[in-house]
């Protein structure tokens, strides 16, 4: 599947927000967005007044790039969220949070969503005892995710465990660090999305 090849720090600077795309680096003073909080390029420091449409578009771009999702797939998530009962924007964020790669990132078994996606594809995890390699799988309450026995001493996994101490675990997940095991104990709510997303702007964009 196609993925972004642009430098991750440039993406954060363009979107005007820290998207935590570089793992541990994002939690240090080396973060490019912290050091240069303006868009990349010769005219990056110039702030342009944006139309309502541009603001909505930027919010959608920021959200899908944070979760590492391409446009067509993101649109499918929105369509399903719009068909469900409840608030469309909150349904959308809940579905994005329940992706397997994001869940693994939230559990602290990877330093970034992109790394989590790669680790899933390489089969480093089991879901309810079965090996999985599909990052977009939707987890549900009661699901148990574990690092496979043969991969528990992987330097990547061990490094991620150090990062989670600074990041914390969201309330909808339960993690047993020593066993490298996590469990989904609730569905993620709007409050569990620890990132400044205005999902209503996305709803307005797709409702045009």
Swiss-Prot record:
CDD domains reported in the protein's UniProt record: S4
InterPro entries on file: Ribosomal_uS4, Ribosomal_uS4_bac-type, Ribosomal_uS4_CS, Ribosomal_uS4_N, S4_RNA-bd, S4_RNA-bd_sf
Molecular-function annotations in GO: rRNA binding; structural constituent of ribosome
Pfam families referenced in this protein's UniProt entry, alphabetically: Ribosomal_S4 (PF00163), S4 (PF01479)
GO biological process, one term: translation
Signal peptide positions (record): none
Entry GO CC: small ribosomal subunit
Coiled coil feature spans: none
Task of the protein: One of the primary rRNA binding proteins, it binds directly to 16S rRNA where it nucleates assembly of the body of the 30S subunit. With S5 and S12 plays an important role in translational accuracy.
Subunit structure: Part of the 30S ribosomal subunit. Contacts protein S5. The interaction surface between S4 and S5 is involved in control of translational fidelity.
HAMAP family cross-referenced by the UniProt entry: Ribosomal_uS4_B
Family, as annotated: Belongs to the universal ribosomal protein uS4 family.
Protein name per its UniProtKB record: Small ribosomal subunit protein uS4
Gene transcribed to yield this protein: rpsD
């Amino acid at each position: 599947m196609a993925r972004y090849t642009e430098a991750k720090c440039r993406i954060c600077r363009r979107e005007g927000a820290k998207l935590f795309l570089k793992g541990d680096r994002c939690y240090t003073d080396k973060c490019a967005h912290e050091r240069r909080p303006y868009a990349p390029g010769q005219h990056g420091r110039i702030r342009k007044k944006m139309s309502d449409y541009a603001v909505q578009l930027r919010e959608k771009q920021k959200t899908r790039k944070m979760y590492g999702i391409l446009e067509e797939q993101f649109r499918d998530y929105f369509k399903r969220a719009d068909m469900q009962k409840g608030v469309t924007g909150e349904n959308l964020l809940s579905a994005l949070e329940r992706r397997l790669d994001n869940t693994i990132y939230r559990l602290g078994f990877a330093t970034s969503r992109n790394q989590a996606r790669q680790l899933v594809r390489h089969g480093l995890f089991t879901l309810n005892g079965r090996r999985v390699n599909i990052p977009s799988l939707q987890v549900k309450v009661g699901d148990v995710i574990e690092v496979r026995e043969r991969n528990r001493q992987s330097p990547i996994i061990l490094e991620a465990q150090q990062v989670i101490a600074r990041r914390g675990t969201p309330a909808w997940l339960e993690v047993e660090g020593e066993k490298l095991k996590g469990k989904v104990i609730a569905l993620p709510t709007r409050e569990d999305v620890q990132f400044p997303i205005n999902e209503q702007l996305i709803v307005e964009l797709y409702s045009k």
